[in-house]
């Protein structure tokens, strides 16, 4: 699936190493390979954007290596491809040797996988499913400040799905563990690939059922009900959390304005 980049090769360039992304001038490189000193490097075509190929190059650059978060405010499709590139680069870096027999592995030519020629084991990129849920109580939404986000941002509750658990069970468990309340009338809304490091966010809306807020201090700094027209600092646009909050606000406005 990979090829040597030629002089006239053009497109979008995802140059990644150790979960970092090369962002000269703060943007994804776009244009001729020669303009970015990429001629002769090996590249994988991982998709297409606006009619042009998107290439992944497994390489570290001395300068301008940043986080894929820096392109989150670009088009959702381009952010998704950048996230795919970073995750694939990390997958190839972390699967050089077979976890069963210890022998070297090589990339598949037909799919995103690493193959062991010794024991025939096949490895795929790991994806960690997560739930994220907006909880509404009349004209208010439950928002929390997470321990890992000490920047004043308040967001909806989220967490990883555990082994042997349905998405619905994960929502009920995470909400109870983090906030002490029960929810009802759960509705699936959308999903979003989230490459931090390798999650798939499954987004829901739910209604408050019962209980008083009792936070898990290992997860949350605080949590509270906020009226739809008096909200704290929110996650940035482009995140599924922001969409859930905005959709909840729109529903409240339709009923209470």
UniProtKB/Swiss-Prot annotation:
Checking CDD domains in the record gives: NUDIX_NADH_pyrophosphatase_Nudt13
Residues that bind a divalent metal cation 2, according to the entry?
A: 174
Q: List the disulfide bonds.
A: none
Which residues of this UniProt protein bind substrate? 69, 111, 124, 192-199, 241
Q: Which UniProt keywords apply?
A: Hydrolase, Magnesium, Manganese, Metal-binding, NAD, Zinc
Q: Does the keyword Repeat apply?
A: no
Tell me which GO cellular component terms the UniProt record holds.
cytosol
The enzyme's first-digit EC class, named in words, is: hydrolase
What InterPro entries has UniProt attached to this entry? NAD-cap_RNA_hydrolase_NudC, NudC-like_C, NUDIX_hydrolase-like_dom_sf, NUDIX_hydrolase_CS, NUDIX_hydrolase_dom, RNA_Hydrolase_NudC, Znr_NADH_PPase
The residue ranges of the Nudix hydrolase domain are: 125-248
Name any cofactors this protein relies on. Mg(2+); Mn(2+); Zn(2+)
* Annotated motif Nudix box, positions: 159-180
The record's comment on cofactor binding reads: Divalent metal cations. Mg(2+) or Mn(2+). Binds 1 zinc ion per subunit.
- Annotated a divalent metal cation 3 binding lies at 174, 178, 219
Residues that coordinate or bind a divalent metal cation 1: 158, 178, 219
Residues that bind Zn(2+): 98, 101, 116, 119
Reactions accelerated catalytically: a 5'-end NAD(+)-phospho-ribonucleoside in mRNA + H2O = a 5'-end phospho-adenosine-phospho-ribonucleoside in mRNA + beta-nicotinamide D-ribonucleotide + 2 H(+); NAD(+) + H2O = beta-nicotinamide D-ribonucleotide + AMP + 2 H(+); NADH + H2O = reduced beta-nicotinamide D-ribonucleotide + AMP + 2 H(+)
HAMAP family assigned to the protein according to its UniProt record, in alphabetical order:
Nudix_NudC
> So what family is this one in?
Belongs to the Nudix hydrolase family. NudC subfamily.
Q: What does this protein do?
A: mRNA decapping enzyme that specifically removes the nicotinamide adenine dinucleotide (NAD) cap from a subset of mRNAs by hydrolyzing the diphosphate linkage to produce nicotinamide mononucleotide (NMN) and 5' monophosphate mRNA. The NAD-cap is present at the 5'-end of some mRNAs and stabilizes RNA against 5'-processing. Has preference for mRNAs with a 5'-end purine. Catalyzes the hydrolysis of a broad range of dinucleotide pyrophosphates.
**What NCBIfam families does the database record attribute to this sequence?**
PRK00241.1
Please report the name of this protein according to its UniProt entry.
Answer: NAD-capped RNA hydrolase NudC
């Amino acid at each position: 699936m990979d090829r040597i980049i030629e002089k006239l090769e053009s497109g979008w360039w995802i140059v990644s190493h150790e979960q970092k992304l090369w962002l000269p001038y703060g943007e994804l490189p776009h244009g001729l390979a020669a303009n970015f000193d990429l001629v002769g490097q090996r590249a994988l075509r991982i998709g297409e954007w606006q009619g042009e190929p998107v290439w992944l190059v497994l390489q570290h650059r001395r300068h301008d290596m940043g986080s894929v978060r820096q392109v989150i405010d670009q088009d959702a499709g381009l952010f998704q491809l950048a996230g795919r590139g970073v995750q694939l680069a990390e997958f190839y870096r972390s699967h050089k040797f077979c976890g069963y027999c210890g022998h070297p592995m090589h990339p598949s030519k037909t799919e995103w996988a690493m193959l062991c020629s010794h024991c025939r084991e096949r490895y795929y990129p790991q994806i960690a499913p997560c739930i994220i849920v907006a909880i509404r109580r009349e004209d208010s939404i439950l928002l929390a400040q997470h321990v890992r986000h000490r920047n004043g941002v308040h967001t909806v509750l989220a967490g990883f799905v555990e082994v042997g658990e349905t998405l619905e069970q994960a929502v009920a468990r995470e909400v109870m563990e983090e906030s002490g309340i029960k929810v009802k009338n759960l509705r699936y809304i959308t999903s979003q690939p989230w490459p931090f490091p390798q999650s798939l966010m499954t987004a829901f809306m739910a209604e408050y059922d019962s209980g008083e807020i009792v936070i898990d201090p290992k997860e949350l700094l605080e949590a509270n009900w906020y009226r739809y027209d008096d909200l704290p600092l929110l996650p940035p646009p482009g995140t599924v959390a922001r969409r859930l909050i905005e959709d909840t606000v729109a529903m409240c406005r339709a009923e209470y304005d």
